[in-house]
């Protein structure tokens, strides 16, 4: 939307928080970045130390830590100790929610020791990992073996547990689905302290399908077995500029990975990686990647771009150059490609450090980047948090592929946020209805990208300050999110709950399906022990009444029954 087309809004009167946010870069440079670098280095040393340990030692430590969690759960007094949650501080999580449920009465269980890669099974092509293993840690181990998780979320600090209990996506999700779709087994400690292993075809198959998106409210995840795939040393990346309106961009994006003849499972026609970045209502760059060998990448005439070096142009800005120079192809080392958005936090780094993209800063201080999201959250008080909720948007909309154009037009009209990130993912038709699910009958009228067993969706990632805020105008962030959520419910979309949500409980369960989740809450004793997923996601501090009602929930509550997965 151009400035002439933008709706007239009154100017917003500046308050003291505006000036603090404007000059927050001082705190970031002199405090947050040095501490972040130190923490990254210490974490790296801990990871290396763990890798040196034998499988037997790591498994022994894992078993001991599991027993500690079991013992801790058994010490809980339901009448006075509160509902169970992890002992992680509210600011540690990468998500944008305030984790307000930890500001009320609760019973903490420490899962911090669960950060080891337990085994890489090359024969079964499975990685067995603990929940606090992060993406940077796992790729450092697997990529030298020419292996990788089927879905590697871009940011280094994202953990396996968060990607399973919450939400995780990457440019390969148009082939493999969301991160949780690549998990073959969950190891869960239930409310009674029992340790169970849930797979899609054992006695805990209902729990297996209910865990994703449950936010840790069915049990405590202590390990997971995740699919590995073979990879090559480089990613051959093609940058294709697109100029047109938002519907044109949406169609070009769809065409970049979804054959119009419906042959979606043909690897010859479908690239290994896909993403599109939209820089304005009329300009975008579609990127497609295919794994390539070292020999191919180093052939005469091919360009290799080591995007991981600290002084390199931030990736989203590098991709934007395609709009000036036209289509081009280059080869990026695979691990550097996986984490291409880490150093600049997509484009959020530009707001945190307005001059951070300048060559002089990148060359002198780029090695300190990125600031840890947890430290950014730890150094902001209540007023700053509320300011960001009102004046800044970090939201993902999971939208059916054929509705992406509509979603882009809605976002442009209501928020005016650019760049926008597009990343496709399969939403599988499972043997049992889960919290998120494809549209009924999609397989009978398959649209572009759909297959017989999966509907193609897209993550429309909206991360930045809205246009009205950048122009100094009045903007109601909470109301904008409420409108977004209403549009999503009407259009069979889903909102990842790492973000700030304005949904009330009724609308939350209009967006998500409660059947299997509530069935497993009752069956496995989570009610009255673990918080409900809405309780955890609800915005705002919990009142004493809300805490008491959640604690006193009992197992004879009327939950909807669901069909069990077929044997």
Curated annotation (Swiss-Prot):
Induction: Not induced by brassinolide. Keywords: Calmodulin-binding, Membrane, NADP, Oxidoreductase, Signal-anchor, Transmembrane, Transmembrane helix. SUPFAM superfamilies: FAD-binding/transporter-associated domain-like. One of its GO terms (biological process) is steroid metabolic process. GO terms for cellular component: cytoplasm; membrane. Pfam families: FAD_binding_4. Residues 548-567 are annotated as: Disordered. The keyword Glycoprotein does not apply. It comes from the Eukaryota. The keyword Oxidoreductase applies. Disulfide bonds: none annotated. Changing residue 566 to A: In strain: cv. Torsdag. Belongs to the DIMINUTO family. This is Delta(24)-sterol reductase. It comes from Pisum sativum. The lineage of its organism: Eukaryota, Viridiplantae, Streptophyta, Embryophyta, Tracheophyta.
């Amino acid at each position: 939307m151009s400035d002439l087309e933008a709706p007239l809004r009154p100017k917003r009167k500046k308050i003291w928080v505006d000036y603090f946010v404007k000059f927050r870069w001082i705190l970031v440079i002199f405090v947050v970045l040095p501490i972040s670098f130190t923490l990254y280095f210490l974490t790296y040393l801990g990871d290396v130390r763990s890798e040196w340990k034998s499988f037997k030692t790591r498994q022994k430590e894992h078993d001991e830590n599991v027993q500690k969690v079991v013992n801790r759960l058994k010490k809980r007094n339901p009448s006075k100790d509160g509902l169970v949650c992890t002992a992680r501080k509210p600011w540690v999580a990468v998500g944008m929610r305030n984790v307000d449920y930890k500001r009320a009465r609760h019973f903490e269980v420490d899962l911090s020791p669960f950060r080891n890669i337990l085994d890489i099974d090359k024969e079964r092509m499975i990685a067995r990992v603990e929940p606090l293993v992060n993406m940077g840690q796992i790729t450092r181990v697997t990529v030298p073996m020419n292996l990788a998780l089927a879905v590697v979320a871009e940011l280094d600090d994202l953990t396996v547990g968060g990607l399973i209990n919450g939400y995780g996506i990457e440019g390969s999700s148009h082939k493999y689905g969301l991160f949780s779709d690549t998990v073959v087994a969950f190891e869960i400690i239930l409310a009674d302290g029992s340790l169970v292993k849930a797979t899609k075809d054992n006695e805990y198959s209902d729990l297996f399908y209910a865990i994703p998106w449950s936010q840790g409210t069915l049990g405590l995840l202590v390990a997971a077995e995740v699919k590995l795939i073979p990879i090559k040393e480089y990613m051959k990346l093609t940058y294709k500029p697109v100029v047109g309106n938002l519907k044109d961009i949406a169609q070009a994006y769809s065409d970049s990975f979804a054959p119009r003849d419906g042959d979606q499972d043909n690897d010859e026609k479908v690239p290994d990686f896909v993403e599109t970045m939209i820089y304005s209502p009329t300009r975008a760059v579609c990127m497609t990647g295919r794994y390539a060998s070292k020999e191919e990448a180093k052939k005469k005439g091919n360009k290799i771009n080591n995007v991981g070096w600290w002084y390199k142009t931030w990736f989203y800005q590098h991709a934007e150059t395609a709009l000036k120079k036209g289509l081009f192809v280059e080869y990026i080392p695979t691990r550097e490609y996986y984490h291409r958005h880490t150093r600049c936090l997509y484009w959020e780094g530009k707001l945190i450090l307005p001059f951070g993209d300048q060559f002089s800063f990148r060359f002198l201080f780029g090695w300190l980047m990125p600031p840890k999201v947890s430290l950014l959250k730890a150094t902001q008080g209540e007023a700053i948090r509320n300011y960001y909720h009102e004046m800044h948007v970090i939201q993902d909309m999971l939208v059916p592929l054929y509705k992406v154009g509509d979603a882009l037009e809605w976002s442009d009209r209501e928020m005016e946020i650019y760049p926008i990130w597009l990343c496709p993912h399969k939403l599988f038709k499972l043997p049992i209805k889960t919290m998120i699910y494809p549209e009924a009958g999609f397989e009978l009228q398959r649209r572009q990208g759909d297959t017989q067993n999966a509907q193609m969706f897209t993550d429309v990632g909206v991360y930045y300050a809205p246009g009205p805020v950048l122009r100094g105008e009045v903007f109601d962030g909470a109301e904008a999110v409420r409108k977004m959520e209403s549009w999503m419910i009407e259009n069979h979309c889903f909102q990842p709950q790492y973000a700030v949500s304005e949904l009330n409980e009724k609308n939350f369960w209009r967006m998500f399906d409660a059947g299997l989740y509530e069935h497993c809450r009752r069956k496995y004793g989570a009610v009255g022990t673990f918080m409900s997923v809405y309780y955890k996601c609800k915005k705002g501090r919990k009142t004493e009444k809300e805490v008491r009602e959640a604690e006193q929930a009992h197992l004879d509550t009327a939950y909807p029954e669901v069909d069990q997965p077929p044997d």
